[in-house]
Structure formats: structure tokens, C-alpha cells
Amino acid sequence: MANREVRETQKEQQADGEKRRQVAGVIGTNAAEVVKTAVSLLFQEYPELVSPGGCAYTTRRYNKCVRDMNYFLRMCSYAIVAGGASVLDGRMLAGLRDTFNSLGIPLGPVARGIQLMKKIVKEKLATAGMTNIAFVDEPFDYIARVISETEI
């Protein structure tokens, strides 16, 4: 009986791993569109970011924002494949948060952009016919939370 349970557990883990790889595949295939759409929605919600004096006002700054969103999406994809947000180093994210603070990048919109990407990714997964994808939320929520936390 114990061997049977072990085999069943292994089958479940294999199926879970395969599903996670499929999710990462959908994210990878659609990454450029996910980021582009999220950035567009973000700047519609926060037009002051791309206005004179905003942190994404120049082409160079805008491109850095897009680059950072790509990094966040990639980190989420890695965490999904790994099976959870534990692979995301909280200290690294806290350091990134401190860097953004020192550069005058508002953290609320960064966290909002990450949440927008989560929503878009889940829409892409639904369109691809994938179900039972609640595990996708964890890395996006974790990064958004750590990035937007403030030290007291």
C-alpha cells in the first residue's frame, strides 16, 4: 500500500510539474504582449508617470520601466516552475525596493503593474483552456507585496 501511495504522489507531482511548465510556456510565448499591455494599462491609470517630471517621462526611462516589468514577469515564471514563491529572495526584492525608492520610482504603481500582469497572464491561460491555475497568483502577489512594503 505504501508503494502505491508513493507512486500516486509521484504521478501527482509530475502532473503538477507539467502544468507549471505549460503555464511558463504560455507566459514565455506571450511575455512581450503581457508586458506591453500591462504597461499601457498602468500608464492609463497613472498618466503622471509619463508626464514631464514623471519617472517614465523620457524614452530611456520608459524603456527601463518596460525592462523592469519584463524582469518581474520572468521572476514570476521562474517561481511558478519552481513550485512557489520561496525561490524569490525577499532580501533581493527588498533591495530592489530600496533602489526604486532612491531613484524616486513610486512603489504603488510598480506593485499595480505586477498585478496587471497577473490578470493578463490569467486571461491568456484561460484562453489557452487551462483551469485550476490559482497557483499562478502566489509569485505575483508575493513580489507586489514585498516591493510595496515600507519599513517602519
Show where each model-derived region lies:
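Core of compact, soluble alpha-helical bundle domains
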Residues: M1-N101, I105, P109-A111, Q115, ...
